Design a protein with these regions (language model features):
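Catalytic core of pol beta-like nucleotidyltransferases
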Residues: 1-25, 34-39, 48-106
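Conserved H-loop
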Residues: 31
Length: 106
């Protein structure tokens, strides 16, 4: 497992521990999701949920200091994510990878 993968796993663990079911999904998108990232690439994630952005950025900063990897989160509230259908959302839905979900499926 590479450093980026370890950093991302730890980020998800900390977000889940801090915010719990307030986070519905964490979706990886961008170059890392497509597999065309390089050493300088950041890790793009979309977080669908009700989270305090300052607290989230504290986690991002801790990961950067501990792993040397920059995670770039975008946060959307669930109702906003459900309504938006712009090119960004379409790209995330088509190329993104759901890394975490608290949504139960039947």
């Amino acid at each position: 497992m590479g450093n980026k993968a370890r950093a991302l796993d730890e980020f998800i663990r900390r977000v889940e521990a801090r915010f719990g079911d307030s986070v519905q999904e964490i979706i990886l998108f961008g170059s890392y999701a497509r597999g065309d990232h390089d050493e300088e690439s950041d890790i793009d994630v979309l977080i669908v949920g009700d989270v305090d952005f300052d607290e989230l950025m504290n986690i991002v900063t801790d990961i950067l200091l501990e792993y040397g990897e920059l995670i770039s989160p975008i946060v959307l509230k669930p109702e906003e994510f459900g309504k938006r259908r712009d090119s960004f959302i379409k790209t995330v839905l088509s190329e993104g990878k759901v890394l975490y979900s608290s949504i139960s499926t039947p």
